[in-house]
Amino acid sequence: METSNQRLALQDAMVFLGAIASGTEQAIGESANSIAYLAGVNLGKKMSEGVAHTSDILQALDSTREFLAKNDYLWLFEPFKPHDQLSVIQEDEDGTHVMLVFRDCMIRQSLFRFGHTQKGSLCNMMFGFFAGALQNIMGRESSLEIVHAGENACYKKLTIRRPL
């Protein structure tokens, strides 16, 4: 019974979160994306305090996944190697890249539950979260770009920028 009540409470919170995102985007337009991004950066930095530092991108992602799970955040993601790549990790002049698949995402579920579109302010909050967390863990700037946003999963490109 407790699990059922917890699920109902979570679903109510998801609808509320979707409504806030929709209303904020309508009220202030594109600025909502920047505000949500900065909020995500702050959250990512705060939640990743005390996490061991590493220069290994896969270890940093494992650490991120671990502290998300410890805090009951439902962002299940994993590195993905496209068939035409030799390795999960790719390097170029911009930095280090890893493709990520987000199979279960509380942001996506909130948006669907409310009936709001993806790629808005809540997705930008996620980008900020990863930027803040990885800045703490790796000491480098990063970006997370949506390649595909779908009903069952999202496909994103994580770039860890080269130090200046």
PLM features: residue spans?
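N-terminal accessory segment detector
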Residues: 1-124, 141-155, 161-164
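Mixed-charge, glycine-accented linear interaction segment located at domain edges/termini
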Residues: 123, 130-133
